[in-house]
Amino acid sequence: MLFNNITIALDMSGCPNRCKHCWIGHFKNGNMSIEDLKYVANSFKDYTNSLEVYSWFREPDFNADYKKLWEIDNELSKNTKPKRFELLSFWRINRDEEYVKWAYNIGVRRYQLTFFGLEEKTDYYVGRKGAFNELINATRILLENKIAPRWQIFVNKDNISEIEKLIDLSKEMNLEERCKEFGEEFELFIHQGSCDGENEKLYDIRITLDDLVNIPKEFYHRLGKREKDLYGELINDSSTKNLVTDFPVFYITSQFDVYPNYTSIAPWWYLGNIKRDGVKKVLDNYINNRSLGQKSSLEVPIKEMVKVCGDQNSNRLFDRDDYIIYIINKYCRNNIKFL
């Protein structure tokens, strides 16, 4: 059993936010040690040609020892190095004067900030008061340090009236011009996000076709198709999908439970526990599609799942891949009691 590359991401410290769009899901913050990180990394090393190690999978750099952990992530990785993926912590940007300078020095040039409208809506969706003002302040601090902010806006029926106001705010702040001053581009994009984890709870308020009048046309390309149209495509689709790859990414919780990063952390994706079962059994479960999620994707045609879990009359908008993940999760939730 030898993979080409394995990526492992541990939830060492958790997250300061409880965002209502979080596709991973909500659970308690952990307090894993550096020894735990080393133990997990060393457990995987013999099963892969290269190993990419991350000490977080929710909020990057939330741990007070973030600098040391980044060094350890690099040291524990095998034949490769961890990446930043345009991700930082706006929570830390507002509390640590050294943080953005450090981020620039390790190569970060862009960082994605997430908004849900103006102050009240963004604070509500992030799950803590003051989040909106922290995002605006983080934008200013990034610009001062020649890191380009990218604004992503999550849209639902309850915040769509604020989208154009947020776009106007980005123009008032001259973000496009400010980024050009140091050779970067400002990007703002709008989407609903996936429909798994916490975001699945927002299914009822997903935008529909008639809501598009409230969004400038240049942002339509990320908003997808009506559910009824996707239903019509998939109801005739007999395909199944093997989710096993030679480059898997695994999430390890603070309790050492392992899940693939395909979608949210849910019981039907559980692969085992490193301490209780050992890495060999976890990987064997993955390779042989033993979780209900992987097994269903491999054995049940998507048309059978959409038939019982889709809505052929719905005008809600979805990206096609996100819709398929939503259907698989819903199917598994309905069937896990039969395991």
Label the predicted regions.
Residues 40, 45-59, 65, 73-80, ...:
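Extended interaction regions within the primary functional domain
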Residues 43, 125, 215, 282-286:
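Residues that form generic nucleotide/phosphate-binding pockets
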Residues 257, 261-339:
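Flexible mid-to-C-terminal extensions adjoining Fe-S/redox cofactors in radical SAM and related proteins
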Residues 33, 88-90, 118-120, 128, ...:
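Alpha-helix initiation/capping motif
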Residues 7-13, 21-181, 188:
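Conserved glycine-rich "GG(E/T)P / GGGxP" loop and the immediately following alpha-helix
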Residues 1, 25, 33-36, 89, ...:
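General structural signal for secondary-structure boundaries
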